[in-house]
Amino acid sequence: MIELAAIEAARERIAGAAVRTPLVRLHVEDAPAEIYLKLENLQPINSFKIRGATNAIMLASAAERAKGLVTASAGNMAQGVAWAARALGLPATIVVPEHAPEAKLAAITRLGGQVRKLPYDDWWNVIITGHVDGTDGLFLHPVQDPGVMAGNGTIGLEILDDLPDPDAIVIPYGGGGLTVGVASAIRALSPQTRIVTAEPETAAALVAAIGAGQPTDVDYRASFVDGSGSRCVLDSMWPLVAPLVDAALAIPVAEVAAAVRTLAERVRVIAEGAGALAPAAALTGLAGTGKVVCIVSGGNINLSKLADILGGATE
């Protein structure tokens, strides 16, 4: 669990870089809950990752940053690091899985980041080990860095500022850094609020871990929900995540696609696959009733894929 003081300090630290995003109501007839959307897709990089990346980089010393920055990311953390590196005049090396969407890769390059593609298993090994062969810059772990998690936790502070009494907060689960950060803030200030995670059923590692009582490998099937889900919950994250999560959900990819369409039609919001996971959980009723806050974690989706989904594609 991240200390509340660290999250509150992060809010001050990142104020010049990250946007205080709105919390808006999603009005849908016969919805099973009173659904609210925390629109992190409106950040400068269209993802919440700017929060954690900025906080972690600002916590590092000038000497630590001098050789440049390195991270491993499916795309959004990469953009956060590249954004901050450009602002500081530093080089950034980004290691991505070879299935990363072109929209995210183009954004990394546009921000000045140097992209290195790896097969998924090799990329996942970087996540596990925190090491990239052939680089000597400051490695910013996209998940388990305490500064990253504290920055992510600022989302929880903003949610409670706008809606002090949510019944549940639904968080898309990728590596666990967003969940630990947000849940730490919520547990400290609103302990009665349920913490619910959502993963694509094609890569529901947390669901499997909770069922088994420990991290366990699952079959990973790539889908357009590329920013969430994994082969296995990181051993380092399991003791942090497990006590904070009240329910873990596996969402069918077709329901995520339907949520992408609903957000576009009803509130003119563009969500990537991971960003639509939480709304999908709420719209299907899996997240429960009452006031349900859904974190729309990002909006970096290939426009061709978005067009396909808006046209009725289910995966």
Model regions: which residues?
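PLP-dependent amino-acid enzyme catalytic core
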Residues: 1-315
